[in-house]
């Protein structure tokens, strides 16, 4: 089963990379800044998805490496800092939504806010995993990190 799963995920990596390249090429030909930004954002997400799929393949093959103590220390500091940044961004975007009347602008702001909320939930899950410093299997990492992310499970 894992061989078939790895093959399927590998195909998904190729699709995400093709999608990213296609969107990047198209956005380079567009003059409207908002359209360009939205297309670039989707292309970036496709590259991110391909990267995450590669990590899944590594995990399925049993090739993932455990974190070192130095990595735990660095991650603890970095994650704590970024949790605060995400909280500030969520508050700032929520304030903008309240004062902006144009629904098109609000749509973009809500899109950004949704991303910030997902980032915040992921960072909290990562922080929990880093703080535990227990021997955690790769699939336990997935559960710890993703359990509070809306719409994931």
List each model region and its residues.
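Non-heme di-metal
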Residues: 1-153
